[in-house]
Design a protein with these regions (language model features):
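Short gly/ser/thr-rich secondary-structure transition/capping motifs
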Residues: 1-3, 21-25, 148-150
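Single conserved hydrophobic/aromatic residue that forms the stacking wall/gate
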Residues: 1-20
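Short, Lys/Arg-rich amphipathic segments at extreme N-termini
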Residues: 14-33, 201
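Alpha-helical membrane-targeting segments
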Residues: 14-22, 69-79, 158-163
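Generic preference for hydrophobic
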Residues: 19, 25, 38, 60-61, ...
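Glycine-rich, highly charged phosphate/nucleotide-binding loops
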Residues: 22-24, 89-94
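Catalytic core of membrane glycerolipid acyltransferases/transacylases, capturing the structured
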Residues: 30-89, 96
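Non-catalytic C-terminal accessory region of glycerolipid acyltransferases
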Residues: 92-229
Length: 229
């Protein structure tokens, strides 16, 4: 990685980082030693392979349609992705994710926005990341990714030489379980909202580093409604 003031120079793992040299990572000291739920914002198809630049073995939950492109399908499988059918309850993917986390070694990447989004706002998230963390009692790591919307815009099949910056936030505790080992829906939703706020801050900071600060349109503030499946 390119080293800059306040940005740690990290060893690159095999993956996108070997062919795309314009990314930097900040906050690697916040990566937990064991399992966690890794929760980045999502603005481009390259957000997923970009995570291979992190000096940890990560496992990924990815939208099944990403496997329709042979190259990305091969790449995502190689770096540890498993497909999720967006818009339906994919029990097999959930069981796989829980099994990885219960093993206690590898982080699971779960994009809590559910799909690629456009614009500067992080709107209400799905509860999946908080649910996985609660069921396995592992921390959630908020991650802000800046610059990927211009490095590979929606609809593009090409990578452009744009700056990308990743900021890894401090781990958040999972929603608690009660004495019977059950989850409170309110606790899960509260954790999800805190996660949204943390990702927004990190995303904003990452965009500033990339020289493209987020600009909010008046009236674009997120509401508290849970996104529809």
């Amino acid at each position: 990685f390119q080293a800059e003031d306040g940005i740690r120079d990290q060893p690159r793992s095999r993956g996108l980082g070997d062919v795309y040299k314009r990314q930097t990572v900040e906050g690697a000291e916040n990566i937990p030693a064991g399992a966690c739920v890794w929760a980045p914002n999502h603005r481009s198809y390259i957000d997923t392979p970009l995570q291979s630049c992190i000096p940890r073995r990560l496992r990924f939950m990815g939208k099944d349609s990403m496997w329709e492109n042979w190259f990305f399908g091969w790449l995502f499988t190689t770096i540890g992705c498993f497909p999720v059918s967006r818009g339906s309850a994919d029990r097999a993917a959930l069981v796989t994710a829980l099994g990885v986390l219960e093993n206690g070694n590898d982080p699971v990447v779960a994009f809590p926005e559910g799909e690629r989004k456009d614009g500067p706002r992080i709107f209400p998230l799905f509860d999946g990341a908080a649910y996985l963390a609660a069921k396995t009692q592992v921390p959630i790591v908020p991650v802000g990714i800046g610059g990927t919307a211009k490095a590979m815009p929606r609809g593009s099949k090409l990578l452009y030489p744009k700056r990308i910056h990743v900021i890894i936030g401090k781990p958040m505790p999972p929603p608690p379980l009660n004495e019977k080992g059950r989850l409170s829906r309110n606790d899960v939703r509260a954790t999800t909202e805190t996660l949204r706020e943390e990702i927004q801050v990190l995303f904003d900071q990452a965009q500033v580093v990339c020289g493209d600060p987020n600009v909010y349109e008046p009236g674009s503030e997120p509401d508290s409604r849970v996104p529809e499946e």
